A protein has these predicted regions:
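N-terminal glycine-rich, Lys/His-bearing helix-loop that initiates the first secondary-structure elements
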Residues: 1-52, 392
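Conserved small-domain helix->loop->beta segment predominantly found in fold-type I
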Residues: 270-331, 335-340, 351-361
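Structural preference for beta-strand elements that scaffold enzyme active sites
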Residues: 151, 180, 202, 284, ...
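A common structural junction motif
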Residues: 240, 328-338, 386-392
Length: 392
């Protein structure tokens, strides 16, 4: 069993199964140990004083965390990776690694809600100017650059409304002024999109979602390009970040089955959306993998697959009360704000306070769905009975 450095080029499924694994380093066991320890001992002062040892203190890593970091680095094609204790923690660390007091950062108007909250409530305290941009801006983002612009934060597709972005064009423009490009890639996972290959410098995943995949651990990952790695590594050590070893191990376990699960999520989602699109009570589906979606061409160019997160809008005239009654009538779909696990979920979409430069649709009742691993026929039956109960 050889390390990744000596393995031939591999396809994505094979990388997911083997990345970060070195069984011979652990007496032949196929999985690394789950290290529960804070203190690291040295054999002598000659080793201790100059720091000539791989591990010095658990906050800086252990064999468990290094296994996941190595796996993410290989899968993302990165210079290095870091593990955070949640997706939001990963987002905050990534942003703080490339901005300082007096800087200007551009953030997509369709960013994840907690990302906006961090940008609006934390960054101004560091004298960092936050400005939001229309996700459809593409190369025209250069018109928003200032002398103090140092970072552009992207997310594709957009949170709740699923707009696609021309990531390569944005990255090319940003690099002309030496700005760092960040991307929240949680929707697609590193299996279906490789942000660094499109010019992104910091690829961020809420590992809680598809990487863990079982709704039983919280995790975040950050994969850095060569130009962004030094800043991320330096900040990570200074911030005292460390993810719990059991959560890290569950992330490693989830990686091994990521392709199998996402294939099912994608297939189930297409089946459910094909049915939903035929319902007269539904006016629009938001899912970039559909040919009818405005962002389909960008999705097809830059992504190799789609996940289970989508949304739909009710027909005109549907009231807020009817939309909520529909959700209450669901039996299989749980009402919960997370996604990426085995279970199907639904939430009402509320864009109040969530958009700055793009106008949210007025009086449109929308529902976000996460399509899980259940049989799609059962999911369709659940949606059907909820529609009938609500609109009978």
């Amino acid at each position: 069993m050889s390390s990744s450095d000596s393995r031939p080029a591999q396809k994505a499924d094979t990388k997911l199964a083997h990345a970060g694994r070195d069984p011979l380093a652990f007496h032949g066991f196929v999985n690394p140990p789950v290290v529960h320890a804070s203190t690291v001992l040295y054999p002598d002062t000659a080793t201790m004083v100059p720091g000539g040892q791989t591990y010095s203190y658990a906050r800086r890593g252990n064999p468990t965390t290094n296994s996941l970091e190595d796996a993410i680095t290989e899968i993302e094609g990165a210079a290095g990776s870091k593990i955070a204790n949640s997706g939001l923690n990963a987002i905050a660390l990534a942003i703080l690694s490339c901005v300082k007091s007096g800087d200007h950062i551009l953030i997509t108007d369709t960013a994840y809600g907690p990302t906006r909250h961090f940008a609006d409530t934390v960054l101004p305290n560091f004298n960092i100017d936050v400005e939001y941009y229309d996700p459809k801006i593409g190369a025209r983002i250069k018109d928003m650059f200032r002398e103090e612009t140092t970072a552009v934060f992207t997310e594709a597709p957009g949170s709740l409304t699923f707009e696609m972005q021309d990531i390569p064009a944005i990255a090319l423009a940003a690099h002309e002024i030496d700005a760092t490009v960040l991307m929240d890639n949680t929707w697609a996972s590193p299996l279906y999109c490789q942000p660094l290959a499109h010019g992104v410098d910091l690829s961020i995943q809420a590992g809680t979602k598809y990487i863990v995949g079982h709704s039983d651990a919280m995790l975040g990952t950050i994969a850095a390009s060569e130009r962004a790695w030094k800043g991320l590594d330096r900040l990570y050590g200074a911030m005292g970040c460390h993810a719990a070893p059991d959560d890290v191990y569950l992330g490693l376990r989830g990686l091994r089955t990521l392709s199998v699960r996402l294939e099912r999520h994608q297939r189930n989602t297409r089946a459910v959306l094909d049915w939903l699109s035929q319902q007269p009570l539904i006016s629009r589906i938001r899912y970039p993998a559909l040919e009818s979606d405005p962002g389909h061409a960008l999705w097809k160019r830059d992504f190799s697959g789609a996940s289970g997160l989508c949304a739909f809008e009710f027909a005109d005239g549907t009231s807020r009360e009817q939309s909520l009654a529909f959700l209450d009538a669901l039996r299989l779909f749980g009402l919960g704000y997370s996604w990426g696990g085995f279970e199907s979920l639904a939430i009402p979409v509320n864009l109040n306070g969530m958009r700055t430069v793009t106008a949210p649709p007025q009086d449109v009742q929308s529902v976000r769905l996460h399509i899980g691993l259940e049989d799609p026929e059962d999911l369709i039956k659940d949606l059907d009975q909820a529609l009938n109960k609500t609109f009978a």
